UniProtKB/Swiss-Prot annotation:
PANTHER family, sorted: GALACTOKINASE-RELATED, MEVALONATE KINASE/GALACTOKINASE
GO process terms (BP): galactose metabolic process
Superkingdom: Bacteria
Keyword Magnesium: yes
GO molecular function, one term: galactokinase activity
GO CC field: cytosol
Pfam families cross-referenced by the UniProt entry: GalKase_gal_bdg, GHMP_kinases_C, GHMP_kinases_N
EC number: 2.7.1.6
Site for Transition state stabilizer, residues: R28
Binding of substrate, residues: E34, H35, T36, D37, Y223
Name of the protein described by the UniProt record: Galactokinase
Gene3D superfamilies from the UniProt entry: 3.30.230.10, GHMP kinase, C-terminal domain
Family, as annotated: Belongs to the GHMP kinase family. GalK subfamily.
Length: 382
């Protein structure tokens, strides 16, 4: 049963009438451009064919009812007439409440809504299940009440909800690619201007995501430390963000910086340049160059930004040994575990899957999870 059929059926059972709309918003994987988003830099993600789906209908009162199919059909209910505060027990509900509250704060006028939510974006894998939920909820209200919002505004609203209501710091990339993704394309995003450019993906190339299933523990504290180190670097150069520093300026004075901060800054500056070049390489179908850039990105995350772990490095090495210069592979996401992403000619996918199955668990004691994805369309009706 598809997520659409599942949510429509649950909706009719729970609320006693049929849903009028079904909306989807996808998860994402970032092909290159890691930790550049909060430095006002460039990222190159694509939306994937794992999504959050919401069957919904408008109400003629001010009540919001939300059922979470993936959390034992838990039901949250709140009123648009009262101040929206955090739910005491249901963490999932706070993503919904946060999006609704921040749409209100943006002076959007809308009435009540019934929703049933289900998704298949793997949670805790760094594939943006939370952003896909935020964008899906924003798109529901925009569609049901014809709100004057474009995809970028729905994305910004989701980011605001996550930062201010849920209380989790995040950049804008995850929401933006979920809202604006384009089938068979990646999206080069300028995280300062929020300008986007669709970049066509080479034909016959699979987007493979492999979850190391190494439990991320340091991710919150270390993420904040990296952010602070980048801000320290920007202050040293008297610039609003590292986006504004050139590699030449950095090289001239790198010795004056704290050695750790210097390594962090070097990663951001080189990663930004790699990301812009990667968009051109992809567009030209130059998988060899794309593979080189992904390898450089991984080495920079490992050695300069220091956010990889041995399990992730092992996975990357196993895949690289199979694909050689026919594709690319690197860690993706915040770091300290999570996933790797690989661009692999479709005919090599079985060999990669076999090599990983034979070697990864033997070397690490952990079983991986293997996803073959297609670059997919952003949020909308389904």
């Amino acid at each position: 049963m598809s997520l659409k059929e599942k949510t429509q059926s649950l909706f009719a059972n729970a609320f006693g009438y049929p849903a009028t709309h079904t909306i989807q918003a996808p998860g994402r994987v970032n092909l290159i451009g890691e930790h550049t988003d909060y430095n006002d830099g460039f990222v190159l993600p694509c939306a994937i064919d794992y999504q959050t789906v919401i069957s919904c209908a408008p109400r003629d009162d001010r009540k919001v009812r939300v059922m979470a199919a993936d959390y034992e059909n838990q039901l949250d209910e709140f009123s648009l007439n009262a101040p929206i505060v955090a739910h005491e027990n249901y963490q999932w509900a706070n993503y919904v409440r946060g999006v609704v509250k921040h749409l209100q704060l943006r002076n959007n006028s809308f009435g009540g809504v019934d929703m049933v939510i289900s998704g298949n974006v793997p949670q805790g894998a760094g594939l943006s299940s939370s952003a896909s939920l935020e964008v899906a909820v924003g798109t529901v209200l925009q569609q049901l009440y014809h709100l004057p919002l474009d995809g970028a505004q729905i994305a910004l609203n989701g980011q605001e909800a996550e930062n201010q209501f849920v209380g989790c710091n995040c950049g804008i990339m995850d929401q933006l690619i979920s809202a604006l993704g384009k089938k068979d394309h990646a999206l080069l995003i300028d995280c300062r201007s929020l300008g986007t450019k669709a970049v066509s993906m080479p034909k016959g190339v699979a987007v493979v995501i492999i979850n190391s299933n190494f439990k991320r523990t340091l991710v919150g504290s270390e993420y904040n430390t990296r952010r602070e180190q980048c801000e320290t670097g920007a202050r040293f150069f008297q610039q609003p963000a590292l986006r504004d520093v050139t590699i030449e300026e950095f090289n001239a004075v790198a010795h004056e910086l704290d050695p750790i901060v210097a390594k962090r800054v070097r990663h951001i500056l080189t990663e930004n340049a790699r990301t812009v070049e990667a968009a051109s390489a992809l567009e030209q179908g130059d998988l060899k160059r794309m593979g080189e850039l992904m390898a450089e990105s991984h080495a920079s995350m490992r050695d300069d930004f220091e956010i990889t772990v041995p399990q992730i490095d092992t996975l990357v090495e196993i895949v690289k040994a199979v694909i050689g210069d026919k594709g690319g592979v690197r860690m993706t996401g915040g770091g300290f575990g999570g996933c790797i992403v690989a661009l692999i000619p479709e005919e090599l996918v079985p060999a990669v899957q076999q090599a990983v199955a034979e070697q990864y668990e033997a070397k690490t004691g952990i079983k991986e999870t293997f996803y073959v994805c297609k670059p997919s369309q952003g949020a909308g009706q389904c």
